[in-house]
């Protein structure tokens, strides 16, 4: 299939290739241990970090008053990543862009074995940004932390020489579009599902024990508060005024 994206090296002034070479060139001057660390981070480290943030988000969502809704939002993160990866399959075949080091052998490649795979869009970048955007809708602090890892992921993919900058940006855009555009449909399915799970044997996956206990105490306290309010209202009722006759008798 003909390549739809122009060859990134077609012109010496191509900013796509220029930025890639600038970042990848750092690897040539870096010590071997740093190259190995960045390569591991680019392939696995960022994903482990995002998984840890997702776990923290899930634990926090279970303790919220709207736990089923919050947990549904967290659950949408990995599902959105899966949808993004499926959407990328036809996109990558349509664009048919080879890895940058295939057409530019002068690049310093730190992650071998990707010669037969396509470059656009970056799967790792799409996965990272998909998690970040989905978590941001549930917890802004954790979403921003995941977003920082997603940006670091993009830098690492350039550092190891396996993607062009536009591959990374394409991954970011694809994941963001999937998360935001499909979120209403996903939540329409996931929220009722999480509510149903919260009423069954899998309730601990959706609602933490402390949150469940607090909710139960609030439900028990509400009728008591209403009864107490009614009694207080009766106690505050005005006393009947004494007649003038009693005053004269005094």
Please tell me what each predicted stretch does.
Residues 1-50, 88-115, 201-210, 236, ...:
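N-terminal transmembrane-helix/juxtamembrane module of multi-pass inner/ER membrane proteins
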Residues 81, 85-89, 93, 176-184:
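Transmembrane alpha-helical segments of multi-pass membrane transport proteins and ion-pumping complexes
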